[in-house]
Amino acid sequence: MAKSISQETLHQMVTRWASPRPDNYRFKIFKDTSDFFRVEYGSVVVLDEKPFLVLGNAKEGRFGIDDQEKFWVKRSIDLTDGSRKIIKLVFYEKFMAKIGGIPWECFRSPKKEARVLKLVAGHKNFMQGYAVEDEKGNVVRVLDVIKGKTLHAYLQNLESDHQTYFYELFPDILSKYIECIKAIKFLHENGEKHGDIRRDH
């Protein structure tokens, strides 16, 4: 049984890394993340006895569409060291996709994501993080935040004529793109597939 963490201790930890809460504020503490809708702003998720303050749901824009909220993905602060983390809670989504008239089923797999995170640990061309089970056995992924723009956003904001782009900017862009392709090759060589390759990632 995991040790319980007191409200007083949480207030002290939060004050160190974020805006302090009123003295009478009571943090909702989650060791079971099964109902991810209940895990909201100001909650604390405890994973392997480590507390994370939830800052809100992550959002992701897609192909020019405004940011879409991902209710199972939480922005957070690791209260032991103040680092920003993304916490992906378990969400078993399934949907059908079709390319060239061929349909297939797509689904989210927390165990696969956990396996891939372990495989790519320390690889400079992959997001870093780790997986941990909550007290109900849900495989939660804790990810480091990547700062900066996507390649897509970077290219959209370039202002140069074609010749300057092609001779001065493109060689470096292509070199970085090839690194991305080699990273995907690394996954394939190790029996894994990415599953969500998009130009806006």
Residue ranges, per PLM feature:
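Structural motif in protein kinase domains
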Residues: 146-161
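Juxta-kinase regulatory segment immediately upstream of eukaryotic protein kinase catalytic domains
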Residues: 2-63
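Conserved hydrophobic alpha-helix
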Residues: 180-187
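Conserved short submotifs of the Hanks-type protein kinase catalytic core
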Residues: 136-150
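Activation segment signature within eukaryotic-like protein kinase domains
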Residues: 176-177
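ATP-binding glycine-rich loop module of kinase domains
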Residues: 60-118
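Conserved HxN/HPN-centered segment at the entrance to the catalytic loop
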Residues: 121-132
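Catalytic-loop of the protein kinase fold
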Residues: 188-201
